[in-house]
Amino acid sequence: MTWPSEARPNINMEYRLHTVKVYVMMEDKQWKNVGTGQISSKYSEQLQGVCLLVHSLSDGSPIMECKIHPNVPYQKQQGKIIIWSEAKNHGMAIHFQEPNDCQEIWEDICQIQGKDPHVEITQELTDDLETFEHMPLIWNWVEMSNCEIHTLKNIAELFPFVFEMPSQKERLALFLENEGYIKKLLQLFHTCEKLKNMEGLYYLHNIIKGILFLNNTRLFNIMFSDEFFMDIVGCLEYDPALDQPKQYREFLTQNSKFKEVIPIIHSQLRQKIQQTYRMQYVHDIMLPTPSIFQTNLLSDITTMIFFNKINIITMIQEDENFLLEVFSQLKDNSIGDERRIELLLFLKEFCEFAKTLQSQKKNELLKTLIKLGIMSVLKVVVHMNDYQIQVGALDIFAYLVEYSPCLVRAYAMEEAQDSEDNDDLLINIMIKQMICDFDPEFSQGIIMTAVLHELLNPENMRTTAKGCERKVFLNFFYKRYMRKLIAPILSIRVKYDSNDNRVYICPDNYQNAQLLGAVLEILTFCVQYHSMYIKHYIFSNNLLRSILVLMSSKHTFLILCAVRFMRKIIGLKDKMYNHYIIKKNLFEPVVNAFMHNGHRYNMLNSAIIELFEFIRKENITSLIVNIVENFFRAFKSIEYVQTFKGLKTKYEEEKKRKSQRRKNLHSIMHPKMYYRHIEDMEVKVKADICCRGIIEEEERQGGGEEGAILPMGSDFTNNYDIFMKNKDTNESESAIEGQKIKSSEASECCPSHGDASATRMSRSHCSSLVPLVDYLYDTDDENDDDPYGNDKHEDEHEDEDEEPPPKRPNLST
């Protein structure tokens, strides 16, 4: 809806007075407050239009007289400010105390311009009016100078606009720093707290929080000083979003007291430690976790904390006696547990601060700590009955491994050279702490899992002057430490419940399941990153079978750990692993767990199906055959996935392929074996002919002697007939071959001399005529496995009638 602007508007000309502040934009685009007065709208004969008139509150003199132009853009902001510009770099602004007063004047302006009074801008602003976007700063900046309880609201409303203007942020930071403004605000805090003025306290919370988010190092130094810190904390207690104030000051004064474990000589070091603790407390505890859009709001405070920690570590290292005194007291058996806890907690915080150092500096620090005896101290204190000390010792050990795993590995191997007792080695002691952790949160186990991952990670192992660190340390680890690590798995016992026909493990409580899960996670890591070493260990200790026993646990997360371990092994597609799984029938516990899970569609169901699906996709033939032949009956009824039917299909395809391969091999080998028989017959017939000729010649020369064995006259003819018959047919091959062999043996070459020596000489003479026959397809090992993996017994039955004759010596003419 619009109103005609040509006609003179019908405006109520009653004398309406509203208190306002008037601002004018100067040539440098800075706003100047020209005074406070009362505003009214009335028709001016001189200006020929409706004007906005402001008269001073103090003396009634005119402060502003501006005609409402039909084509000038006016804008209303925050319900209390009206701004406009009549010329370039010339702006006007009026700030009302009450929104209703502002709305009355705004309706007059919209009526003159023919606009809807519900809009907040009458026309599009030009580039010259960009400064008006932040007009609320005008009123609030003026209120800043008047630090009073009644101005706290306007001061608090200033910060959201300042954060959008980097130039204004720096200006505000300078103002707060130079005017002693923080001190004035904290004086108001005491007043409001004494008067229990909750509204004022809420505004002060937002103001102090806004100052922190200015992210200015100079302001941080003021706010975290001894003079102001506790009052700053007090302001932050009154969060308007909470029903009750927090008790930060009570905690800091009663529970968190700064104590010098070792007297600090340097005052600068003491000041840095206190300031760092205060900043860390405010950053971590008192301020809410920033969103992804606010990650840089406190970047300067985190930077200050970072460099403060570096300075603290450096100053402590430069003090030669400080660390010496700490370790001498830790090694002293006469000190009490309370004192030992204090020293250990200091050492833990010292190591935590050292995380900020560069790698080279960390190595130097760790070498210094090892030289001072930190490892031997940890071995002693970790055996103490105080749980806080045990966790502290593990935390320190974790920091050292994180700083330089190479140095810790080197220390571990040097330590082992001087000790034959594996239980006395540092890493074994720490592993024992993990195994004996009775904390429901399993805190020590979590720490040691991360430590062992770091120590066993081959990516941070290097090649040293003494050789490859990976090979040396892993050999050492599997020899001296692995037995301790897998002890919880090997100690598991099983019991059979006849009522539900199931096997259960014991112990099977949640705490033990957590431990076993952590050990399995480490072993899975080993399978992935140093497979050769863990493979030997698995085979020699039958470790996979022991791990799969855990699939009878009542804790699903532990069963999943076991499945994940086996899945990692199968994922390697290693033939030795596959043979081991088949030989030990290790799919049985997996299938049992799957069947006991029933029709529940959960992580266990998905994990086991994924394992079998991987085998199917990768076509691991040996495993497919084992699964289908032994377990397909259990999977036959499963229809909601095609994995198991796919395994059956793969199995049938492989079986068909083997059968076809066997047929192809038979078609190639059968003719060659047949011609081999024919060649054998030819050689033997020639031998008969040779022997017959020699005998006939000897008979013509002198006749046969009594006692000589002469072949029958029909022997040659019979053998020749048999030979010719085999040329035409292959029927009754084995029987005929047997007759030939007997006939050949009977037809020995005999000389005409009757004595036995002469007979032996004739045999030798005949044998020397022909060398041994070398057949192309002969093999010396009759028990060799079929290269295609066929069943030997089945082949013997199938090829019984086609077995070739054994090799024999033969003669030729």
From Swiss-Prot:
Residue stretches in coiled coil: none
An MF annotation (GO) of this entry: protein phosphatase regulator activity
Region (Disordered) residue spans: 730-813
Family: Belongs to the SMEK family.
Native source organism of the sequence: Mus musculus
InterPro entries, A to Z: ARM-type_fold, EVH1_PP4R3, P4R3-like_central_dom, PH-like_dom_sf, PP4R3-like
One cellular component (GO) term of this entry: nucleus
Pfam families: EVH1_PP4R3 (PF22972), PP4R3 (PF04802)
Biased composition (Acidic residues): 777-788
Name the record gives this protein: Protein PPP4R3C1
